[in-house]
UniProtKB/Swiss-Prot annotation:
The protein, known as: Putative ariadne-like RING finger protein R811
Active-site residues, record numbering mapped to chain: C945
One matching Pfam family: IBR_1
Signal sequence range: none
Assigned keywords, A-Z: Metal-binding, Repeat, Transferase, Ubl conjugation pathway, Zinc, Zinc-finger
Matching InterPro entries: HMCN1-like_VWA (IPR056861), Multihaem_cyt_sf (IPR036280), Thr-specific_kinase-like (IPR052969), TRIAD_supradom (IPR044066), VWF_A (IPR002035), vWFA_dom_sf (IPR036465), Znf_RING (IPR001841)
Zn finger (RING-type) location: 801-854, 930-961
Organism, as annotated: Acanthamoeba polyphaga mimivirus (APMV)
Sites where the protein binds Zn(2+) 2: C930, C935, C950, C953
Domain VWFA as annotated: residue spans: 8-201
Lineage: Viruses, Varidnaviria, Bamfordvirae, Nucleocytoviricota, Megaviricetes
Length: 990
């Protein structure tokens, strides 16, 4: 408060039984109201006075004057609606109690729903109160009470929910005489009470607040003439009890600033930064109010949004993270339970980024001269939080926005050419209109902090984002700002990059900083280069590399070295030949019972020739074609080959049609040693039972390589993550650090979250070999070079979104349907747009239920990620008639026919409200339709009076008639008493 006298706040509350709903909401609201008022530092002391009536054990009670808000909370929580034997209450006693304790200028908020005792409503408690007050030398006359309040500098603002003259006239008289206003609430829910009271007090302080729906001001229908009133009984029609009454009307509420309370709330920003006790108070209030039921109280003035932004900027205070977590929980809760409030809070957070007050002040006070100045020549504008993404991610989209701004800057030399702004005008939220120029005479500190204000009005960067902005201006060679940017970067060299901040570990920021090493210290360069490699490793999991691998045959006709078996005289592959006791070649098929045990020999030639293991239960019959009589099905230079899945040796196959199990050579299947030889070109191994080539293995070239070396190589496209998983130690030695073993390296982790788990190696090595599927890559050196190129660049291979045809890092593309037969991929936004097109209550887009390319239903995990609700509809396997439009029913949650296409050329507009015919015909028992023609929702009455409020459209109506809707509860009660004689007449069906 700006050098004003002390001002106190008194809150007077009717706590009788009729205030049940009102007081229940009020007790919650008061806790929010007193905390919000406390952080304005305008009100010095607060006192809450509760009153009932003279038939109750407790007529009045008070919290006493307190300056510490925590001392009020127990009293507020103890407020209960009780007692009150007749309609009027002991309001005059409460007013006298107030007069007894007031010491300073006082603002009074008076909540009530009933009049004070008066001869027009006199019953038993009337006599009790008049006797008590007169006997105690107190004031009983209402008009005299109002005059005394005014004389004592007490201004009263009644807040009531009754429009009847018999009630409202007393409070209109009180507010008129004391200089206040009477506020009429159309609804007494917590939200309306809190919003109205806080906005009332903030308006008195000088904040521009618009009172929208839910509250009106009550005024006399003619000009108030105090001199015509003698007392409460001779009241000239301003109060009940006379033959003619002056009407009480409702008008739109407008509250002017009061000189007692006028203050500049913006000064509290500097207090937050300078006073630790005040900062503690702000944190405590935000923590208390950060709940779904009370967070709206923070949204009624932009100063509270500024406090939220200050809290979010406080990096070294653990309370910030607690509040941010609370806010996340609140937003998630409101998103599910109260969409309207969720929108309000989201907009409030958005407003918290707008610092137009501060920016305008910097331009006016820190600039030596207005010109030369920078202005923006563009039609594109952004929100402050959009441009502030520059501080968080430095991604391409945000950087392009900044470049767009810098390229649209113009230099103005003459003051008369500057954009004109009415500095006295305020926007819809009470903020000044932003100035649209930035003087170049501002010091660099301010120039680069408020420069984004041109494209995102209200933007005011802290040091870090302003340094990033200067970096972009320098890199893009902006002729107006390059020299200033260079000076700014040189001045802060080594002073602004805090390695404890998560934002400094993002890939975009790292890559940007390494473009200007001249403005980094040696330590910072080493820091960024190291984490650029870490980032490069993390993002390249989906990058594809071309690798050359030794070919893997499976029932494939290949070149072969063959020799004649000296027993059967068939030309056999060298992989099937053994040496008998006489030193002659003997193929596996020629082994006979005469040579060895029958079972063993059966297994020998069975395995070698057709790979069918005897132990699997498959037996060799006596009339089998296996054995020496088995003829070769290939010529003398070719055989059908397999690769053993255990030892990876190649071996030939004779009876191909008998092969029906996993390939395994004889040695691996029976765990015996079998000689083999390795090709010096393709590195494939071959079974060599007779050791024909094993003795000269250093010069062995396999038959496939002899014929055509290119045919012995399979060229594969393999994802980097598959190579990494099989060569971890090798790749770690190449890059110089080890990634943590307990995480999925390519699972989308941020660098900051794993940086403490990264083990930096003392030295790096230069291995030249890599394996894939247990075989050595033939082009390992080239693959290593390609891998390191991607890792060291801090960038990843891009792929094409097959829906929007934009390029994205492959790690940011997903399979559209998840089926192996469909390899189509798309970006997140396109996936969300495609599968998210169908919404409950709207027209069903049948195509969006399937993959846009293969036309199959997507896998559950894909669909659930982008539209979980639609999973149930897809699972029902509905067949859709192409001649019909279908809608998604709000009630049965099933696709239902809407109209034939031949009857409706254009798609029907369902507006999210589609209910199928079957569901529409089902109504709850004893229900009545809302009489609002635009609503018509079925409503059930479950006890209480006959005043009803539709929860859908908020209209009021009489349950007995249910044929007319009213705007207010007051109109409904007027109808009930006039037509039905009261609010509780029973319907014959009830």
């Amino acid at each position: 408060m700006d050098n004003q006298a002390v001002v106190d706040l008194a809150i007077v509350v009717d706590a009788t039984g009729s205030m049940g709903t009102f007081l229940s909401s009020l007790s919650e609201s008061l806790q929010q109201i007193v905390q919000i008022i406390d952080i304005t530092n305008v009100i010095q002391n607060i006192n809450i006075i509760m009153y009932r009536d003279y038939c109750d054990s407790v007529i009045t009670a008070s919290s006493g004057w307190v300056s510490k808000i925590d001392d009020l909370i127990p009293f507020i929580r103890g407020l209960r609606a009780s007692g009150g034997g007749d309609t009027p209450e002991a309001g005059k006693t409460a007013a006298n109690n107030l007069l007894d304790v007031v010491k300073n200028n006082t603002i009074v908020i008076w909540y009530a729903d009933a009049p004070p005792h008066h001869k027009s409503n006199a019953r038993d408690n009337f006599a009790r109160e008049i006797n008590t007050l007169i006997g105690s030398d107190k004031i009983f006359d209402w008009i005299e009470l109002c005059d005394t309040l005014a004389a004592r500098n007490i201004i009263v603002y009644p807040i009531i929910n009754r429009h009847h003259f018999d009630t409202s006239s007393f409070y209109v008289a009180m507010s008129t005489i004391t200089g206040g206003k009477t506020l009429y609430l159309e609804s007494t829910n917590e939200k309306i009470i809190t919003q109205t009271t806080i906005k009332l007090l903030l308006s008195l302080m000088g904040c521009d607040n618009e009172f929208k729906s839910g509250v009106k001001e009550l005024v006399y229908g003619s000009e108030f003439n105090r001199s015509s009133i003698l007392d409460e009984n001779n009241n000239a029609g301003y109060l009940p009890g006379t033959r003619s009454s002056i009407l009480v009307n409702t008008v739109d509420l407008q509250v002017q600033t009061h000189p007692w309370l006028i203050t500049n709330l913006r000064s509290l920003v500097s207090l937050f930064n300078a006073d630790s006790h005040y900062k503690d108070k702000i944190f405590a209030v935000f923590k208390s109010l950060m709940k779904p039921t009370s967070v709206l109280s923070l949204t009624y003035n932009t100063i509270f949004a500024t406090f939220w932004r200050l809290i979010c900027r406080t990096y070294d205070d653990p309370r910030k993270e607690v509040l941010k977590e609370q806010m996340s929980v609140v937003l998630e809760n409101l998103k599910k339970t109260n969409r309207e409030d969720h929108v309000v809070v989201t907009e409030w957070i958005s407003d918290s980024y707008n610092q137009t007050y501060e920016v305008n002040d910097i331009i006016k006070t820190k600039a030596v001269s207005k010109v030369p100045a920078l202005v923006l020549d563009t039609t594109r504008f952004y929100l402050p939080q959009e441009i502030l993404e520059l501080s968080r991610t430095c991604n391409a989209k945000v950087l392009s926005t900044v470049v767009d701004m810098l390229s649209s800057i113009r230099l103005i030399e003459k003051e008369e050419d500057l954009p004109k702004t009415n500095e006295q005008e305020l926007d819809s939220k009470g903020r000044p209109i932003p100035l649209k120029y930035i003087p170049l005479s501002l010091p660099n500190k301010y120039l680069f902090s408020i420069l984004p204000h041109l494209i995102a009005p209200g933007s005011n960067f802290s040091l870090r984002p302003s340094m990033i902005l200067a970096t972009v201006a320098y890199i893009t060679n902006n002729q107006i700002l390059k020299d200033r940017a260079k000076n700014h970067l040189e001045y802060h060299k080594g002073k602004w990059i805090d390695q404890s901040l998560p934002e400094n570990y993002t890939g975009g920021f790292i890559n940007l900083m390494l473009r200007v090493p001249e403005f980094l210290t040696d330590e910072e360069i080493s820091f960024f280069k190291f984490y650029q490699k870490v980032f490069g490793l993390l993002i390249n999991g989906s990058t594809e590399l071309d690798i050359d691998m030794p070919f893997t045959p499976y029932k494939k006709v290949c070149n072969d070295f063959k020799r004649e078996c000296d027993h059967c005289h068939h030309i056999r592959s060298f992989t099937l030949l053994t040496i008998d006791d006489d030193g002659k070649y003997k193929c596996g098929l020629c082994h006979s019972p005469a040579d060895d045990d029958t079972d063993t020999l059966n297994r020998v030639y069975t395995i070698i020739s057709c790979d069918t293991p005897g132990e699997t239960g498959m037996t060799i019959s006596k009339d089998t074609t296996l054995g020496p009589s088995s003829k070769e099905h290939q010529d003398d230079y070719h055989s059908v080959y397999l690769e053993c899945k255990s030892c990876l040796c190649h071996y030939a196959l004779v009876n191909v049609d008998k092969m029906n199990v996993t390939p395994k050579c004889y040695g691996c299947r029976f765990d015996v040693y079998l000689p083999n030889v390795k090709c010096i070109i393709c590195t494939n191994k071959y079974v060599d039972p007779a050791k024909i080539y094993s003795d000269n293995s250093e010069t062995f070239v396999c038959p496939q390589c002899v014929s055509d070396p290119r045919s012995s190589i399979d060229i594969l496209k393999v994802k980097f993550k598959d190579i990494y998983l099989q060569n971890k130690s090798t790749i770690h030695s190449l890059v110089g650090f080890e990634m943590p073993s307990d995480i999925n390296v390519f699972g989308g982790h941020s660098i900051f979250s794993i940086k403490d788990k990264i083990n930096i190696l003392d030295h790096t090595e230069n291995p030249t070999s890599l394996v894939f599927n247990r075989k050595f890559m033939l082009n390992a050196p080239i693959v290593i070079i390609e891998m390191l190129k991607w890792i060291n660049s801090g960038s990843a291979e891009k792929g094409l979104c097959m829906i929007c045809f934009n390029e994205f890092s492959k790690s940011n593309l997903r399979q559209i349907c998840g089926r192996k037969v469909c390899q189509s991929v798309a970006c997140y936004d396109c996936m969300k747009s495609w599968y998210g097109e169908n919404k409950v209550g709207d027209l069903i887009h049948v195509n969006a239920l399937t993959c846009p390319f293969c036309k199959q239903c997507p896998m559950f995990n894909i669909l659930a990620a982008f539209n979980r609700q639609v999973c149930a509809m897809v699972r029902t396997n509905n067949s859709f008639d192409i001649d019909w439009w279908y809608g998604w029913c709000l009630k049965c949650f099933q696709p239902k026919k809407v109209v034939e296409k031949e009857c409706s050329e254009d798609a029907p507009q369902l507006g999210g409200k589609f209910i199928c015919e079957e569901c529409s015909n089902v109504k709850p028992e004893n229900s009545k339709e809302c009489p609002n023609s635009l609503c018509k929702i079925p409503i059930i009455k479950d006890g209480g009076c006959n005043h009803m409020e539709c929860t859908a459209c908020k209209k009021h109506f009489c349950w007995l008639c249910a044929n007319v809707s009213y705007e207010t509860s007051e109109e409904t009660y007027d109808h009930l008493y006039k037509i039905h004689g009261g609010a509780f007449e029973y319907d014959q069906d009830d």
